[in-house]
Amino acid sequence: MSSFDTIAVLGGGAWGTALALTAARAGRSVTLWEHDAGNAQHLIEARESRFLPGVRLDDSIKVTQDLAEAARAQALLLVVPAQVLRSVATSLQPLIAARTPLIACAKGIEHGTHRFMTEIIAECAPNAVPAILSGPSFAADVARGLPTAVTIAATDADVAQALAQAMNSGSFRPYHSTDVRGVELGGATKNVMAIAAGIVAGRQLGASALAAMTTRGFVELVRFGKAYGARIETMHGLSGLGDLTMCCSTPQSRNFSFGMALGRGESIDTAAHGKLAEGYYTAPVLLEMAQAKGVEMPISTAVAAILDGRLGVDAAIEGLLTRPLKAEE
């Protein structure tokens, strides 16, 4: 099994830059690919990302716009939005060596196809080994070397373990798993729950309401996970409960801050600040997938209704509070 001495990170945004720094700290030879010419030039000249001001890029990290050059690495971290992963994976297929791990670092479900990230990779880049990296991790924390733990999953246990070892550093601790579906499902589901938590905070409904929402949101995550074959220990782990807890508690989470703005009465366009949170795209897909399996997800239903304009925030909250009483699961 390869030790993955060379790693390419595709995407020079905040999270991509943070992971490139992490791989460099772990002793890997790192190439950072950025498709936008302006952003790439800034990375080269300023040695920092526009999205992480004040965090210097390690001198050993090579920045490139040449996808073929990046594709020569022994493992590639795909740090691109969930809704554009397909095009990137398709472009990589003719460039990568057989059995090259492509590790999705986005948390979402593809709109229109209901595909999870590793399913997209398997479909578009059959030469690759699909993997997923997820867990409670903010780019600013990781970039600055603050202690962080995540999960890396691949169906091949040896690959998952080798990838975890390759990214392991003094401050970044990856656990490995073969429950690919569970890991990516947790990350996608928490996006929607974080919007709900943000709405509660923005509406100033109090700490009790926020705790209740987060807890019942976790119940929905577990229900959905069971229906789609996730392991219970994964849902209770970093990529499930860990990520949910983090993103439902701080405006550092884009989904939470988006929800806060909605809770304060801002429009979706204003709340987005020019870039919609991933949970906006995940909510309707999550609901469709839950309905297909007969999974009850009232919080997700309420969020989807708010986002598509069928319900106002107050009506959605009232609807949740007036549901028939039931035994706690």
From Swiss-Prot:
**What molecular functions are annotated in GO for this chain?**
glycerol-3-phosphate dehydrogenase [NAD(P)+] activity; NAD binding
Q: Does the keyword NAD apply?
A: yes
Q: Which domain of life is it from?
A: Bacteria
Provide the active-site residues from the annotation.
190 (proton acceptor)
As its record notes, the protein acts as a catalyst of: sn-glycerol 3-phosphate + NAD(+) = dihydroxyacetone phosphate + NADH + H(+); sn-glycerol 3-phosphate + NADP(+) = dihydroxyacetone phosphate + NADPH + H(+)
Its annotated pathway? Membrane lipid metabolism; glycerophospholipid metabolism
Residues binding sn-glycerol 3-phosphate: 107, 135, 137, 190, 243, 253-255
Q: Which Gene Ontology cellular component annotation is one that this UniProt entry carries?
A: cytosol
Similarity-based family: Belongs to the NAD-dependent glycerol-3-phosphate dehydrogenase family.
Fetch the NCBIfam families from UniProt: PRK00094.1-2, PRK00094.1-4
Function as written in the Swiss-Prot or TrEMBL entry: Catalyzes the reduction of the glycolytic intermediate dihydroxyacetone phosphate (DHAP) to sn-glycerol 3-phosphate (G3P), the key precursor for phospholipid synthesis.
Identification of the protein by name:
Glycerol-3-phosphate dehydrogenase [NAD(P)+]
Taxonomic lineage is: Bacteria, Pseudomonadati, Pseudomonadota, Alphaproteobacteria, Hyphomicrobiales
Q: Which gene encodes it?
A: gpsA
